[in-house]
């Protein structure tokens, strides 16, 4: 959603771009408005995936309010050490044309989706990532406690192979649906 806002070129998109490139986080009000607007669209009625939201307790509370009367919210925390985060992001690339993310494998630096040039993401510079990790520990880590007592909260080991992480997430979603629990 943030990348879409940036690509839109609107004043809000330009503001979002400046904040992200500086390693900051979007304030709760703007972020919640972006998310609830998107989740209110018809294609989200069958289900949705939020990556990186909520990031703060107030955002989580707004999401809880939005979810009233809807199917249970499954919350998955993908646990990963700071060292592994830094390692992975150091090799992450993005297509200049279509925005597709890719890993630097040393092969042809062209996007597999559109053929565009792959470049390092501005917001993945080491100092920016370290700043984001500091902000994460201060603002986002408390969400683990906020959600941990709920039956639909699951923690997944993010250091596994991507397919194994995905499988564990799918199992968590299926287990929550089977139990009919609510977050």
What residue spans do the PLM features occupy?
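ATP-dependent small-molecule kinase phosphotransfer cores
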Residues: 1-70, 81-87, 121
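Conserved phosphate-donor/acceptor-positioning beta-strand/loop module used by diverse small-molecule
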Residues: 51, 69-93, 102-113, 119, ...
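NTP-dependent small-molecule kinase module
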Residues: 120-183
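Short, flexible, mixed-charge acidic loops at enzyme active sites
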Residues: 8-13, 108-114
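Residue-level recognition of specific faces of alpha-helices
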Residues: 4, 15, 59, 77, ...
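Signal for well-folded cores of large energy- and translation-related assemblies
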Residues: 21, 39-40, 68, 90, ...
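Residue-level detector of flexible, active-site-proximal loop/helix-junction positions
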Residues: 1-2, 82, 102, 160-162
């Amino acid at each position: 959603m943030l990348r879409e806002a940036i690509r839109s070129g609107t004043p809000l998109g330009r503001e979002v771009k400046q904040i992200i490139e500086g390693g900051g986080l979007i304030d709760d009000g703007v972020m919640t408005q972006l998310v609830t607007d998107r989740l209110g669209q018809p294609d989200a009625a069958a289900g949705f995936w939020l990556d990186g939201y909520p990031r703060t307790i107030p955002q989580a509370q707004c999401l809880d309010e939005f979810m009233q009367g809807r199917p249970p919210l499954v919350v998955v925390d993908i646990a990963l050490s700071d060292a592994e985060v830094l390692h992975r992001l150091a090799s992450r690339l993005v297509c200049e044309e279509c925005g597709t993310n890719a890993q630097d494998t040393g092969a042809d630096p062209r996007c597999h989706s559109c053929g565009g040039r792959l470049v390092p993401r501005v917001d993945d510079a080491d100092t920016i990532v370290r700043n984001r990790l500091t902000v994460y520990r201060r603002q986002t880590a408390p969400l683990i406690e906020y959600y941990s007592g709920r039956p639909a909260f699951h923690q997944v080991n993010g250091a596994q192979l991507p397919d194994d992480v995905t499988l564990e997430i799918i199992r968590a979603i299926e287990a929550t649906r089977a139990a009919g629990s609510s977050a």
